Amino acid sequence: MFDAKRVSEITGLLKRKRAKRIMVQVPGGLKMSVQGLSDALEKNGFEVLVSIEPCFGACDLRDREAKALDCDALLHIGHADMGVEAVLPVIYYDYFMDHDFVPLLRDFTNHIKYKNICLVTTVQFLGAIKAAKKFMESRGFSVRDGGKIMGCDSLQAKKYEKVVDCYLFIGSGRFHPLGLQERVGKPVLFLDIENRRLENLIGEKNKSEIRRRLRIEKARSMKNFGILVSTKPGQSKIKLALKIRSGLKAAGKNAYVLVGDCFTAEKLLGMRIDVLVNTSCPRIRDDYEQFNKVILNPEDVEEL
């Protein structure tokens, strides 16, 4: 998956930074090929360390670990720079997937009943957007290129909300299109390239709001609140957590700031916590079944 062209591009980036010892960080989907990349970079004179911690995005840099191990740079593959401040140079390498959306679109465009569409995807499929847009326009659609979105960031696409009838997300995984659907009033269509199906997520927005209201109502009668603060550099919001803690205490609740890297139910064993307030990644709220606790977002606390 890291062919000679990609290895050459990465080598050039590392040489421009004059890096010798580097830590490589990849998302889970690329771990099967990271050893081959490590071997190739070692042959080019670099000393390579491979991070095996989960990688959820450019918010989740392992720069402090790299610094502690005397690395000259962190090579972060597969996610775009989010502007997260790091303690050593971070080299971002976009890993674009060689994928053609057109064959799938050919099967599903007749099922799309909207005319004005904003087309979006994730960063690894950006190279496929131009051809997809051209194909849809040839079928009579008016298409805006909304570029890349993430489950936690859809500002670029949201600016088209007033001029389109719907959004069309083409890619894999529901986290990103559901995140967009929560932020816009127009329907988000999810064309799933893995399962080859088209889904309208507007109904999920209504269900999500009902679940949110139920969580808030349940939390009102509960006493012990744990406020999750991530140590991941792009997710850490300690000031917000302390503000929430003060507000909860003023309302007569017991509130504790809980700090961690990755949050799991096992890490909370032995603690008397009724409600979790998530100031970290939005994905955590979707894991309420794993935690078996009420999980609120910061804005939900204001409605208690």
Predicted region positions:
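The feature marks the mature, well-folded catalytic cores of soluble enzymes
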Residues: 2-9, 14-206, 210-211, 260
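Redox- and metal-dependent alpha/beta enzyme cores, enriched for Fe-S-associated oxidoreductases
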Residues: 175-254, 262-270
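Asparagine-biased alpha-helical interface segments
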Residues: 1, 73, 261-271, 286, ...
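Glycine/threonine-rich flexible loop motifs
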Residues: 85-86, 237, 286-291
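Binding-cleft/active-site segments that stabilize strongly anionic ligands or cofactors
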Residues: 80, 273-275
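A conserved acidic, glycine/proline-rich C-terminal tail/linker
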Residues: 258-261, 277-278
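Short glycine-rich anion-binding loops that position phosphate/pyrophosphate groups of nucleotides
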Residues: 79-82, 172-175, 232-233, 281-284, ...
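Peripheral docking tails and interdomain loops at the edges
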Residues: 194-198, 203-205, 279-304
